């Protein structure tokens, strides 16, 4: 089982490993883990960030999360919003990595990245594929 998370989120080459499907499944995992809570989501200006952003939002909504969309924003702004609004966070950014890379930084309600224990729990859900989808009945 490959470790997904690094120091702060995941970073991968877009459309090699970090595909819309990968982002969707990772968002299912995070959405399942936080049990339908609210998530504030933002992205950076990379061309492919919008694709990953849309996949993450879709995955969170499928698991019953409420989503606040910030769109194009800076990571510190999203961190502030998480603290201010008491929400979880997801930032689509590769920070300083080369242009072909992108990443997803999940945040706690404090605006800080997930701690190791939370990373491990999200990874377990990701690899087990035991997602909690909301019923639309």
Annotate each predicted stretch with a short phrase.
Residues 1-58, 62-64, 127, 137:
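An N-terminal, well-structured beta->alpha segment
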Residues 31-109:
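Ferredoxin-reductase
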Residues 21, 76, 116-120:
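Generic alpha-helical secondary structure signal
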Residues 5, 9, 99-102, 109, ...:
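Residue-level signal for pocket-adjacent positions within structured domains
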Residues 104-137:
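Gly/Ser/Thr-enriched, mixed-charge loops and adjacent short helices
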């Amino acid at each position: 089982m490959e470790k997904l998370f690094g120091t702060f989120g995941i970073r991968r080459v877009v459309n090699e490993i970090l595909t819309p499907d990968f982002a969707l499944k990772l968002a299912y995992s995070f959405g399942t883990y936080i049990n339908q809570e609210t998530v504030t989501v933002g992205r950076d200006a990379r061309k492919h960030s919008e694709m990953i952003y849309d996949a993450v939002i879709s995955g969170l909504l499928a698991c019953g999360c409420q989503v606040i969309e910030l769109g194009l924003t800076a990571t510190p702004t999203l961190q502030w919003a998480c603290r201010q609004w008491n929400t979880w966070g997801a930032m689509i950014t590769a920070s300083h990595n080369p242009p072909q890379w992108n990443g997803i930084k999940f945040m706690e309600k404090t605006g800080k990245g997930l701690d190791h224990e939370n990373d491990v729990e999200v990874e377990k859900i990701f690899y087990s594929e035991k997602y909690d989808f909301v019923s639309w009945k």
